[in-house]
Amino acid sequence: MAWIARHIALIAALVPGALGGLAPPASAAGASPWASVNVCDPPTAPGAVGVRVGMPAGPGTQWIRVRIEYYAAAGGRYVPAAAGGDGGWTRLGTGAMGVRGGTTFHFDVPAAGHQLILRGAVTLEWRRGGRTTRRARIHTHAGHAADAGGTSLAQCVIRR
C-alpha cells in the first residue's frame, strides 16, 4: 500500500495537473498577501469598485478589512472615504491554506468633467484564541489578473 502512495506522489510531482482538482494548491493565495482592484465602474454597475484579496495560510483564522481611499488632489495624497468605504471585518478561512475574498463598494459617480481616483487599503489579520497572531497592511496593486478574475488594477478611475 505504501508503494501506491509513493507512485501517486511521484506522478503528481512529474505530471502537472495529474490529480486535477483533487489536491489543493499549497497556497491558493500565494506566499505573500496581495490586493487588487478587480471591478472598476462597469457599465452594469456605475460607480462600483471591487477589491479582491489573496491571503496566505498562517497562524490562525484569516480575517480581512477592506477600505477605500480616494485621491485628494488638494493634499496630493490618498485619504479614507468618509462614507461607504469600509467593508468591515470578514472572516475568510481557518488559516490552514491560502484563501481569496473581497468586497465591492458602490459610490455616486462624479459630475460631468470630474473624476474619482480610488484604491483599496486592506488590513489582514491572522487570529487565534482571541488575539491577533499576525497583521499586514497593504494597498491594491496591479499584476494579479489570473487571481482576481481577469481584471487587476492598482486603482480605479471613475470619470464622467
What are these regions (language model features)?
Residues 111-116, 122-133:
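Extended, solvent-exposed regions of the mature portions of secreted/cell-surface glycoproteins
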